[in-house]
Amino acid sequence: LIMTSQAYRQASRRLAKIDEIDPDNRLLGRMNVRRLEAETLRDSILFVSGQWNPRMFGKPVPVMEDEVGQYVVGVSTNDSSNRPTGKTVSLGTDAFRRSLYVQVRRSRVLSFFDAFDAPAMEPNCTKRPTSIVAPQALMLMNNEFVLAQSRAMAGRFQRLAKGRLDAQLGLAWESALGQ
């Protein structure tokens, strides 16, 4: 119900006239800027890329260790000695389900979530840490998931804009900023 309210759906643009009347935004003249949590950030990337799978319920999306030691969405095909077998298992569109469905284990936190302050998987996690550090920017520039979703987003905008560069840029701007 709150997400459909007018106050929640407002723009976060600051206007001098409103800032004079209500500098602390107690009257909710605008939406306060808020930091995206790890799960919300991943879901937003999936949605903007056009890959997002809205299917609800069902089995969790599995997490595995990749060849460089990061935990990523996927099915491990290692043998009983934990050696790579070279086999791959496709998750299809299940790999693009909401982060709510990503398997959570204390020993296997998705590396993307870990970089963006996912909650500690311990009995008493009363407060979620918040940080702004260099590894977050590096994750957004170099992570294979982010790069793949960026390519999917670019392809989607090329199709929608029918090759017109100005239209592609407009779509990217509107999608990235939610306007």
Predicted regions and their residues:
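Short, functionally critical alpha-helical segments immediately adjacent to catalytic or ligand/cofactor-binding
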Residues: 1-4
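An acidic, gly/pro-interrupted, aromatic-rich
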Residues: 7-177
